[in-house]
Amino acid sequence: MTAVTINVAVVDDDASVCRALERLLRASGFAPLTYLSAEAFLLDRPRVIVDCMILDIHLGGMSGFELQKQLAAAGSAPPIIFITAVDDPDTPELARQAGCVAYFRKPFPGHKLMETIRSAVAARNSN
């Protein structure tokens, strides 16, 4: 039986967060793709298959919410997990309204994120 590669895109303007998530994802058996901006992700999007996305809400330039809207409008939004370091009481509800599968405030437990990715990909593949 051949193992299925699960590509997980990470979009965060903090390079250290991208590196940490890349290591965690790789150690958990995922294939990480990291981007420091929404614009960089969009440039690469036609060439990559993304099974799940970890998306920072507050990016320089286009925000995570704006990127999610653009992907949804194009009909190409993978399951999205929003992350943020901002402690704003309205943000979790805004993230849910945007259609995310989960929302995590930094810092968050890595094992919970990995469980969420597995569940999101399994749910998407069962449809």
Where are these regions (language model features)?
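Short amphipathic alpha-helix used as the core "switch/output" element in two-component signaling
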Residues: 65-76
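C-terminal output helix
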Residues: 90, 108-118
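Alpha4 helix (beta4-alpha4-beta5 surface) of REC/receiver domains from two-component response regulators
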Residues: 66, 87-102
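Acidic catalytic/metal-coordinating carboxylates
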Residues: 36-37, 63-66
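Active-site residues of response regulator receiver
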Residues: 56, 84
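Acidic, metal-coordinating helix/loop segments flanking the phosphotransfer/catalytic sites
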Residues: 34-52
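The feature encodes the CheY-like receiver
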Residues: 18, 60
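Conserved acidic segment of CheY-like receiver
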Residues: 5-15, 21-25
